[in-house]
Amino acid sequence: MRTLRILAVGRIRTPFWQQAATHYMERIRHNCRLTETVVKDGGAALPPTARNADEGARLIAAMGPTDIVVCLDEHGRNMTSRDFAGFIERLTENATRTPCFVIGGAFGLDKSVLQRAEHKLALGPMTFPHEMARVVLLEQLYRADAILRGAPYHHD
């Protein structure tokens, strides 16, 4: 069974994104061990740079020594769903390390977090709200698992 981790800034507040995230987390957990760690948002009164630094420090503190840090970033690598499935398969070959997908807050990820990344992944060329990005990531993790299992979820 694959082990995956999501490390994100802030809880999902919008009800329909909460429902979608719960839906995919429940589906993923039938075949994968998935944990989610949520760190507190930076202070809303802080300027974006200070807020990112604050959130970045929390994210780094929550990272484990065996995490394979994969940051979601608009400048990251774009992949097809099949490529992403292969990427997940390669990352989970070593059972002593855990892929940890890191999602920033409203202003993205601090450079200190991006410097810790072993991989940077883009969900596409467009920018998404961080709540939506979390749901898209969850769906793609579920899809990748279905592809790797040969389940009839993904259609080319």
From Swiss-Prot:
Bridged cysteine pairs (disulfide): none
Tagged with keyword Methyltransferase: yes
Reactions catalysed, as given in the entry: pseudouridine(1915) in 23S rRNA + S-adenosyl-L-methionine = N(3)-methylpseudouridine(1915) in 23S rRNA + S-adenosyl-L-homocysteine + H(+)
Entry keywords, A to Z: Cytoplasm, Methyltransferase, rRNA processing, S-adenosyl-L-methionine, Transferase
Gene: rlmH
Matching Gene3D superfamilies: 3.40.1280.10
Function comment: Specifically methylates the pseudouridine at position 1915 (m3Psi1915) in 23S rRNA.
EC numbers for this chain: 2.1.1.177
Lineage: Bacteria, Pseudomonadati, Thermodesulfobacteriota, Desulfovibrionia, Desulfovibrionales
Binding site for S-adenosyl-L-methionine: 72, 104, 123-128
GO MF, any single term: rRNA (pseudouridine-N3-)-methyltransferase activity
Annotated SUPFAM superfamilies: alpha/beta knot (SSF75217)
HAMAP family per the UniProt record, alphabetical: 23SrRNA_methyltr_H
Keyword hit for Methyltransferase: yes
Predominant localisation class: cytoplasm
Pfam entry (one): SPOUT_MTase
Family of this protein: Belongs to the RNA methyltransferase RlmH family.
Enzyme class at the top of the EC tree: transferase
Summary of subunit composition and partner proteins: Homodimer.
Name recorded for this polypeptide: Ribosomal RNA large subunit methyltransferase H
InterPro entries: Alpha/beta_knot_MTases (IPR029028), RlmH-like (IPR003742), tRNA_m1G_MTases_N (IPR029026)
